[in-house]
């Protein structure tokens, strides 16, 4: 049974294994990519181009390539989105994965293409089943 206590919910999130934490690092695809691939969400990977949809004015609508993905904190670093430390060295501004949309996918990995195809088929089956149940009513 799952607890309703927020403290226990947070504890579960903090102690998730990396392979389960990976599922939390998903972002919506842009409308064009949704139509092209037939899926709505996908896990963010290094090399994807993303657009920031929430945040401060200087971050909002910023578009860039993902440089690093931190599974422990659930945040991503985007190329060109930096701030300067007191000594002048630039550091990345980490953005939470849920605050971005993916505008361009990095499809250099064949496994990722398989994942997209598998998700597309599952979505088509779901929509077909949903359509049949609404017709039956």
Swiss-Prot record:
Cellular compartments per GO CC: large ribosomal subunit
Q: Name one GO biological process term.
A: translation
Q: Does the keyword ATP-binding apply?
A: no
Which SUPFAM superfamilies does the annotation name? Translation proteins SH3-like domain
Oligomeric and partner information? Part of the 50S ribosomal subunit.
Its function, per the record, reads: One of two assembly initiator proteins, it binds directly to the 5'-end of the 23S rRNA, where it nucleates assembly of the 50S subunit. Located at the polypeptide exit tunnel on the outside of the subunit.
The identity of this protein, by name, is Large ribosomal subunit protein uL24
Organism of origin: Sulfurisphaera tokodaii (strain DSM 16993 / JCM 10545 / NBRC 100140 / 7) (Sulfolobus tokodaii)
């Amino acid at each position: 049974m799952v607890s309703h206590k927020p403290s226990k919910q947070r504890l579960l999130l903090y102690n998730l294994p990396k392979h389960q934490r990976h599922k939390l690092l998903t972002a919506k695809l842009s409308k064009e990519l949704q139509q092209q691939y037939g899926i709505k969400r996908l896990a963010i990977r290094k090399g994807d181009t993303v657009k920031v949809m929430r945040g401060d004015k200087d971050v909002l609508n910023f578009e860039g390539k993902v440089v690093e993905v931190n599974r422990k904190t659930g945040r991503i670093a985007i190329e060109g989105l930096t701030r300067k430390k007191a000594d002048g060295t630039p550091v990345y501004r980490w953005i939470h994965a849920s605050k971005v949309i993916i505008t361009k996918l990095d499809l250099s990995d064949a496994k990722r293409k398989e994942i997209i195809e598998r998700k597309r088929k599952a979505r088509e089956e779901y929509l077909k089943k949903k359509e049949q149940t609404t017709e039956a009513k």
